[in-house]
């Protein structure tokens, strides 16, 4: 597919371009507004790389005055649209496939079709990545763009060949038949397509059905099987894997430790060694109705959960709930009388039934793993935010599931209206009990009984001193990590005077800090002199992507996986102009002048950047600056040759001295530098790297905001200089997939809880209306624990959010496995025990988007811990439970002897 070049289109008058960035911004804004006003299913959207879109946003944000005068450092118009950083490297240009686990507004943006058309007219580029708008949800219909269509692996039963089929999840079974038959050339009346999940025939798909693929429980990357009437191979396959397979019992594990399947990759692909049409009897679809009763000595609760395509987050949360003793006990009994099918806040009992069915299968005998397909389908129906195949947050899924189960099991069929009374200086215990009873009068379920507690909230008006006290229920405690206040960043410093090799520095800066904070920390780390400054820039694809010149800009705009450099410069004298010189490095098989508009030029390494003040600038001046930069990279034993017109050599010392004059002295006139041959082949180029003009010593260059040149490296230069120092820039923050990190900077769960309970002012967007002042005030808020539940869940807030990105904190949190004593944090003193022990953990490994969830859970009766990694289950030592991957902690109350006796007496009376 050939996309026309924007330069060609301008030259030939193919399209009319906006005359200013402001006009361009206005046109796009109007098109976006028009699209939002006319939302309908099937509208087309296009995926654009966030990197390119950010450069475009900065371009159109400048004023017309800045653009015309050239005063803005962001005046450069972006090059062609470039989506190559978000598509698979081996992707077909005519059918580009997005990389897995990308995040919207972090890796890509979505624009309506009309906006895409305009951007392509103005900039060209691509490749185009088209997606459709779909409508989903049960009670509340919402629109969303299906960024990742359903990917199915089609196995042809005739020859066992495999083909990838891509369709939207809302496509019908009928459409699936049409696509498969068109692809294979099989008449539709002879085709039979099976749901072949886990290489087992789970059901024949009806060729005439308009049921969607999602409603049919087909999931990302799963197998489907094509059988053709009259084919001997298909007949053989049918006889060996037909419906009689359902009669084959699952063989119970003969080991005390169930190892189910193998490790599952975080993108939803399971590792398998050999492909076969014959089934592996290792897993069970949760749609099955058969259950086996646990025999004597058999263990339940050791079944894994198959990954259905980035569902490790769901599997982790489900395993933690599936090992919560009171919840397991409740759902393994008959709970049908508690199902509330008429609750408008519930899901007609369907979510509770799906969860209960899944729980029974996880605790039945002979289970190696369970495929939670029916549960996933119900979840997507009632919570469209969890539909599709993007990675999600296990805590967010847990919060929705607990709330949904409560509403489906709420015994209160008709909620009474209760007018809340003012506290009127009454004792706290009286008000708290009254509000808890009000809450219970409208909310009565096993979830409330087991998982909900109560905290005290105190607000103090900063103006009049009015105190407001309320008591509110909670399902879990989301506690901050004190380390979220800071952030470590690694930046590579380049010395423009050639005094040192490029050096990476890692500094600690405020999480919500500014560019000034980073420059100050870097300056301290690299011993920056008073007459020196640092110029920060992001390097992408071996070019300068953007500069960070506004000291007040937020650090949140810098992502952890970006490559940031700082150029150490001598400060320019006051009154002198500042023009940037960017030196790019290139090398390719054909000489640059023989390349076609730069397409054969292969860039490498990190650009050199400095300020220059000689006007006009000559080729010899640039050569001198380049030699200065390269001087510390000179190999000790490299051959040294003076340039003679055909061979390159390093410059004599006089040239290196000239460079410092160009960089620091605005009044220096360089007369003798232009009399020499250049030591490198240097080309003047544009910001897109499409045009090249060879430079000679005497070449005269007018300076703009940024002057870009390209240096052509050949084998001789690589022999003379160690170019490895220009490559392999470290990321701002490299997140390790391993959770076993140093615990030097560990914090305790208690310090997290204390940060959660600490008094703090409300945010400006969360003002409190003071009933005394009759004004919204930024009051001070203080939380205290009042009533704790039997099951206490701590959510460690490892993920922080800003306008530009999400960030993860990998700090190790030291949490007790036994004897978590919360007595001193509970204001309501009574005879209850506030001692807890850990029984489950939801873990998150790696960074955002590309991470993976697992779970630790304890079989309490056996006092043994197990690791649940999707379908893989293994025993684990208790000492391994505590690591920096811990994300959600599940504790159960350890009752005192008095409480235990009271509970036993109550049970006997019932």
UniProtKB/Swiss-Prot annotation:
Pfam family, one: DUSP
MF terms in GO: cysteine-type deubiquitinase activity
Alphabetical list of Gene3D superfamilies matching this protein: Cysteine proteinases, DUSP-like, Phosphatidylinositol 3-kinase Catalytic Subunit, Chain A, domain 1
InterPro entries recorded: DUSP-like_sf, Papain-like_cys_pep_sf, Pept_C19_DUSP, Peptidase_C19_UCH, Ub_carboxyl-term_hydrolase, USP_CS, USP_dom
Active site (UniProt): 312, 852
A single GO BP: proteolysis
Enzyme Commission number(s): 3.4.19.12
Highest taxon above the source species: Eukaryota
Domain USP, residue spans: 303-894
Physiological role: Recognizes and hydrolyzes the peptide bond at the C-terminal Gly of ubiquitin. Involved in the processing of poly-ubiquitin precursors as well as that of ubiquitinated proteins.
PANTHER family: UBIQUITIN CARBOXYL-TERMINAL HYDROLASE
Family per similarity comment: Belongs to the peptidase C19 family.
Name the UniProt record assigns to this protein: Ubiquitin carboxyl-terminal hydrolase 9
Species the sequence originates in: Arabidopsis thaliana (Mouse-ear cress)
Gene that specifies this protein: UBP9
């Amino acid at each position: 597919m050939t996309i026309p070049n924007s330069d060609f289109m301008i030259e030939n008058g193919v399209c009319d371009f906006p005359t200013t960035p402001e006009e361009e911004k206005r046109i796009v804004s109007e098109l976006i507004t028009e699209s939002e006003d006319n939302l309908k299913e099937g509208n087309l959207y296009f995926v654009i790389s966030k990197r390119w879109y950010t450069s475009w946003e900065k371009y159109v944000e400048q004023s017309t005055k800045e653009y015309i005068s050239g005063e803005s450092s962001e005046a450069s118009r972006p090059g062609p649209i470039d989506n190559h950083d978000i598509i698979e490297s081996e992707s077909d240009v005519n059918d580009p496939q997005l990389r897995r686990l990308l995040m919207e507004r972090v890796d890509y943006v979505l624009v309506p079709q009309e906006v895409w058309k305009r951007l392509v007219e103005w900039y060209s580029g691509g490749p185009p990545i088209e997606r459709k708008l779909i409508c989903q949800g049960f009670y509340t219909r919402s629109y969303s763009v299906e960024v990742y269509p359903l990917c199915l692996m089609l196995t042809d039963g005739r020859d066992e060949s495999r083909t990838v089929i891509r369709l939207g999840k809302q496509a019908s079974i009928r459409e699936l038949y049409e696509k498969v038959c068109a692809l294979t050339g099989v008449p539709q009346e002879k085709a039979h397509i099976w749901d072949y999940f886990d290489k087992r025939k789970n059901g024949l798909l009806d060729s005439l059905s308009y049921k969607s693929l999602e409603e049919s429980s087909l999931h990302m990357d799963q197998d489907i099987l094509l059988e053709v009437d009259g084919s001997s191979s298909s007949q053989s396959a049918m006889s060996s894997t037909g419906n009689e397979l359902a009669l084959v019992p699952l063989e119970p594990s003969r080991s005390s430790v169930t190892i189910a399947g193998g490790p599952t990759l975080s993108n939803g692909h399971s590792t398998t060694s050999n492909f076969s049409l014959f089934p592996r009897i290792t897993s069970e679809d949760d749609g099955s109705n058969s259950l086996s009763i646990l025999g004597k000595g058999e263990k339940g609760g050791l079944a894994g959960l198959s990954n259905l395509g980035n569902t490790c987050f769901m599997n982790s949360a489900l395993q933690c709930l599936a090992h919560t003793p009171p919840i397991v006990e409740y759902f393994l009994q008959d709970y049908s009388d508690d199902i509330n099918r008429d609750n408008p806040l519930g899901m007609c009992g369907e979510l509770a039934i799906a969860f209960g069915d899944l729980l029974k299968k996880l605790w039945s005998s002979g289970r190696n793993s369970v495929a939670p397909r029916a549960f996933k389908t119900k979840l997507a129906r009632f919570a469209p935010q969890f539909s599709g195949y993007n990675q999600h947050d296990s805590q967010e899924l847990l919060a929705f599931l607990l709330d949904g189960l409560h509403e489906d099991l709420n015994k209160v069929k008709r909620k009474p209206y209760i007018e809340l009374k003012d506290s009127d200086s009454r004792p706290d215990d009286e008000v708290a009990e009254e509000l808890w009873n009000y809450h219970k009068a409208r909310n009565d379920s096993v979830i409330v009984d087991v998982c909900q507690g109560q905290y005290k909230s105190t607000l103090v008006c900063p103006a009049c001193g009015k105190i407001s006290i309320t008591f509110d229920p909670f399902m879990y405690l989301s506690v901050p990590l004190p380390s979220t206040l800071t952030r470590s960043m690694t930046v590579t410093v380049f010395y423009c005077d050639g005094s040192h090799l490029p050096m990476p520095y890692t500094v600690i800066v405020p999480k919500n800090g500014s560019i000034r904070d980073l420059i100050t920390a870097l300056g301290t780390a690299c011993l920056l002199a008073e007459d020196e400054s640092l110029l920060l820039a992001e390097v992408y694809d071996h070019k300068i992507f953007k500069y960070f010149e506004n000291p007040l800009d937020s650090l949140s705009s810098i992502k952890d996986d970006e490559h940031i450099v700082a150029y150490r410069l001598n400060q320019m004298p006051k009154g002198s102009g500042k023009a940037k010189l960017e030196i790019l490095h290139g090398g390719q098989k054909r000489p640059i002048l023989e390349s076609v508009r730069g397409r054969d030029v292969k860039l490498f390494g990190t650009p050199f950047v400095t300020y220059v003040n000689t006007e006009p600038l000559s080729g010899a001046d640039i050569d001198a600056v380049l030699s200065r930069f390269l001087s510390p990279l000179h190999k000790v034993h490299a051959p040294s040759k003076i340039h003679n017109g055909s061979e390159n050599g390093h410059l004599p010392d006089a040239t290196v001295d000239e460079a410092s004059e160009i960089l620091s002295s605005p009044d220096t006139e360089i007369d003798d530098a232009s009399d020499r041959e250049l030591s490198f082949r240097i080309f003047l180029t544009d910001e897109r790297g499409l045009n090249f003009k060879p430079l000679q010593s005497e070449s005269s260059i007018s300076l703009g905001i940024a002057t870009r040149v390209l240096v052509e490296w050949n084998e001789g230069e690589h022999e003379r200089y160690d170019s490895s120092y220009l490559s392999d820039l470290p990321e701002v923050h490299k997140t390790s997939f391993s959770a076993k990190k140093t615990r030097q900077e560990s914090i305790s769960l208690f310090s997290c809880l204390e940060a959660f309970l600490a008094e703090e002012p409300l945010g400006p967007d969360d003002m409190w209306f003071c009933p005394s002042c009759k004004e919204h005030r930024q009051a001070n808020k203080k939380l205290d624990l009042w009533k704790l539940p039997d099951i206490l869940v701590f959510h460690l807030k490892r993920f922080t959010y800003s306008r530009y990105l999400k960030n993860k904190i990998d700090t190790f949190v030291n949490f007790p496995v036994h004897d978590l004593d919360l007595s001193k944090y509970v204001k309501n003193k009574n005879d209850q025990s506030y001692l807890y022990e850990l029984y489950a953990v939801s873990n998150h490994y790696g960074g955002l988007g590309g991470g993976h969830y697992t779970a630790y859970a304890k079989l309490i009766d056996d006092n043994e811990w197990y690791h649940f990694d999707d379908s893989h289950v293994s025993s684990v030592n208790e000492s391994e439970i505590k690591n920096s991957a811990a994300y959600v902690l599940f504790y159960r109350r350890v009752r005192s002897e008095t409480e235990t006796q009271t509970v036993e007496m109550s049970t006997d009376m019932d």
